[in-house]
């Protein structure tokens, strides 16, 4: 996590088959924040022909999308948030979300904000059946790949390939245009969204929170500049959140090094492997915010009780181990939430 910027289809099927299978009963329009979803009959989401995914062992985009279809088959709603076409790209790729059939206080799961962090999207694909089962017990909103072009070309941001101390990359999760300025709460931190993608994603979060208010949010990240990970807890309980503590235990049990104290490389204090709420203008801060500014007007924010961001070390671990750690984390948390939804 950096200040301000944290830091379709079954296997082997042809592209034509991919496009024919990836269908949504409802296409979510990108209108004003408070607008209702716009329906379209049998709207089709397409992955363009010829999309090549960075070859480091991560699943191709087509295989990720194949896993999402299993949720659609289980009755989940597939929403098109935006068609992403960042600078330097020639084709648009869909940013999608999936919602379990029954609305209500929900578990939100996000991944793929940073394109050079593939473990989360791959773990979500492997955990689809577990997430489907969780959706039978609790409302769930899944944003499985928020930066598809970044994933395909191994770029962290929409406009920069790597984190930089001297340049602010445009993250798809930038929320500064909706979050109050701490020094002047009546004004947002930025006058406009940093990109069309950030605008669309944050509008989706605000709008969807009406029917699926986030109770618990889980955001999967990696950091290739550290050898020990940690968990951000942006919610009400901070470092005392029992889910954050359980997550630290799961990661340690799985052999993932966790920094238990000291500070992150951004100067944030770590207590038991957990960092309490920070002001970073991320989508996670937005999901936990009790008050936001939309079109210049203050309104209640999504107000999630628990907002967890997992930063696992990528520097010295092969991808398969990183995916396995994220998969174990998802399965354990899904099982815990299904058994004890009061958490």
PLM features: what roles do these ranges have?
Residues 1, 8, 17, 21-22, ...:
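C-terminal accessory segments enriched in acidic
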Residues 22-34:
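Bacterial N-terminal signal peptides
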Residues 79-81, 96, 141-143:
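General small-molecule cofactor/ligand-binding pocket signal
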Residues 75-90:
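N-terminal cap/lid segment of alpha/beta-hydrolase-fold proteins
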Residues 95-103:
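Short beta-strand-to-loop junctions in surface cap/lid or active-site-entrance loops
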Residues 104, 118-127, 132-249:
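Active-site/substrate-binding loop(s) of hydrolase catalytic cores
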Residues 106-111:
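Short beta-strand element of the alpha/beta-hydrolase
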């Amino acid at each position: 996590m950096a200040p301000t910027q944290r830091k379709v289809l079954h296997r082997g099927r042809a592209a034509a088959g991919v496009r024919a299978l990836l269908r949504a009963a409802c296409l979510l329009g990108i209108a004003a924040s408070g607008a209702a979803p716009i329906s379209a009959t049998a709207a089709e989401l397409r992955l363009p022909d010829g999309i090549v995914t960075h070859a480091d062992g991560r699943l191709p985009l087509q295989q990720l999308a194949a896993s999402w279809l299993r949720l659609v088959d289980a009755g989940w709603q597939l929403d098109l948030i935006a068609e992403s076409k960042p600078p330097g790209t020639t084709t648009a790729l869909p940013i999608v979300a999936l919602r379990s059939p029954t609305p209500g206080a929900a578990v939100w799961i996000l991944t793929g904000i940073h394109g050079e962090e593939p473990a989360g999207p791959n773990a979500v694909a492997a955990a689809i059946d577990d997430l489907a089962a969780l959706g039978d017990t609790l409302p769930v909103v899944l944003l499985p790949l928020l930066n598809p072009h970044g994933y395909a070309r191994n770029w962290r941001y929409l406009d920069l390939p790597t984190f930089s101390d001297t340049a602010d990359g445009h993250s798809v999760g930038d929320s500064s245009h909706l979050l109050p300025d701490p020094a002047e709460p009546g004004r947002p931190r930025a006058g406009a969204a940093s990109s069309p993608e950030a605008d669309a994603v944050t509008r989706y979060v605000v709008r969807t929170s009406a029917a699926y208010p986030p109770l618990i949010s889980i955001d999967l990240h990696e950091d290739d500049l550290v050898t020990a990970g940690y968990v951000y807890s942006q919610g009400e309980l901070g470092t005392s959140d029992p889910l954050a503590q359980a997550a630290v235990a799961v990661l340690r049990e799985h052999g993932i090094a966790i920094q238990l104290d000291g500070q992150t490389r951004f100067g944030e204090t770590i207590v038991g492997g957990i960092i309490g709420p920070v002001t970073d203008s991320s989508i996670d801060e937005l999901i936990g915010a009790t008050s936001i500014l939309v079109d210049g007007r203050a309104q209640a924010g999504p107000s999630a009780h628990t907002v967890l961001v997992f930063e696992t070390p990528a520097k010295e671990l092969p991808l398969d181990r990183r995916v396995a750690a994220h998969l174990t984390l998802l399965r354990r948390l899904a099982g815990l939430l299904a058994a004890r939804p009061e958490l």
